[in-house]
Amino acid sequence: VERRRLKPIALLSSDLDGTLAGDAPATSRFRSKWQALDPEHRPVLVYNSGRLADDILNFVDEVGLPAPDYVIGGVGTMLAGPRHTPRLAHFPELSHFAQRFSEGWSLDKVDAVLGSLKDTVRQPDGYQHAFKSSWYLLDASPEALASIERALAEAGLSVTMVYSSGRDLDILPRSADKGQALAWLCNELGIGLDEVVVAGDTNNDRSMFELPGARGIVVANALPELLDMARDNSLIYSAKTPFALGVVEGLVHWSVFADA
């Protein structure tokens, strides 16, 4: 891709844990660089996390990240505007975002299938909501995951299964993941995917990187499952630095920041 033909970045969608969060000085560096951008012209800032929406907003305050314009929570199953931001005023009612998840989905059935398996452990209630069933499953083989998919299908469910970090298993409605939620938001905002940059570190970020035309930043501490995506892909930048410093490095590469 010829750099000069790329459109300016209009939106940053970043994961939190292991990406913008995980190294306090790096997080602070990102915050100062972001806040130095002209508020009228800087990209829309979206935090796209497996955490639930309220938890994201509390966590952002806790670690000192800049306030987001929007949050996508629950691995693409929740969408919210932040607290006290006038930028939300022009945004249409968010409730219709979740209406698309109902078909083929039953939380009770999902929980029954996963709860019947011997190696799965239900994650705490703080990680669960109406369209996200989250479990711990250590070092699952592809065969074990395929077996779970079959069991869910046999129960009449139409779901997306996301396994990341060799531990975290999220069962979501078929039309839910971080990438699809981001694409929906961009469409509502009138922002093209070729004006978007995404950042992440694990497999549950993969769907963001797969959006056609979107640019990416894979931080140096990313798991192999995501690092492999960046090979031979000119739209995905592999940072040499980890955590938020890697995001800063990537934003220099994509011309959002002038320097690191």
Model-derived regions, located:
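Hydrophobic "anchor" residues
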Residues: T19-L20
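A general structural motif
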Residues: K7-I9, R42, P68, A130, ...
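Non-catalytic pre-domain segments flanking phosphatase-related domains
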Residues: V1-S14, S32-A36, D61, I191, ...
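Active-site phosphate-binding/coordination module
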Residues: S28-P124, N221
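Conserved acidic, metal-coordinating active-site core of Asp-based
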Residues: D108-A199, N203-P212
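Mg2+-dependent phosphoryl-transfer enzymes with acidic/Ser/Thr/Gly-rich catalytic loops
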Residues: E2-K7, T27, L172, G179-A260
